[in-house]
């Protein structure tokens, strides 16, 4: 697959379940969101189980179940997988107008479990989304010489009840680098879950996402310093 292993799964949930999940999202302006608002990203997220309404709680439980992980194994052929019950980096995600997420590599080591993060599952949950607003996940190839993203290869359009599952260990650059242009009051809603494998001995440990600057940011020293500071800060937490 180009640029790395990924699977797009439409009609992921029964449509009535998908609609109910979308309706259970908190209001975007509710104060308990964690707001990532910096030169690299503009999104809100929540991953606390105690805040999930009943159906959302049940769905995250199912997506982390042995039964569902067996389904993931059948789709991907990856045999050794563990759930991330703590939803580290997962849970609810929301983007408003102007929301974005620079192209990046996910962290590859779960800091609590010391397992390799192997697969990322994202399900889009905004009905009646116009794809001209953006919001589709972009998958980019890897430039071996610069060790940076090379070019956009795939855009997985933000279509209601569509899931994308992808391998995060293959220099899997991805993101939403172009600010979303949806109307005010419309939001890109998604849920995310990650699956892990045993840690290979030769793994280059990265416990925090590694971001790349956009083309417009490539010569912006403040942005480049911010990217370095994120990595340095995390390395001090080991």
What positions do the PLM features span?
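N-terminal auxiliary "cap/dimerization" subdomain that precedes the catalytic jelly-roll/cupin core
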Residues: 1-42, 66, 217-238
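Histidine-centered active-site/metal-ligand motif
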Residues: 6, 104, 174
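Short beta-strand segments
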Residues: 8-10, 91, 120-122, 165, ...
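Signature of the catalytic double-stranded beta-helix
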Residues: 20, 24, 44-89
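PAPS-dependent sulfotransferase catalytic core
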Residues: 43-55, 121, 189-196
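Acidic, glycine-rich loop-and-strand cores that form catalytic or ligand-binding grooves
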Residues: 83-84, 90-94, 116-117, 128-129
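Catalytic core of Fe(II)/2-oxoglutarate
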Residues: 98-99, 109-117, 127-238
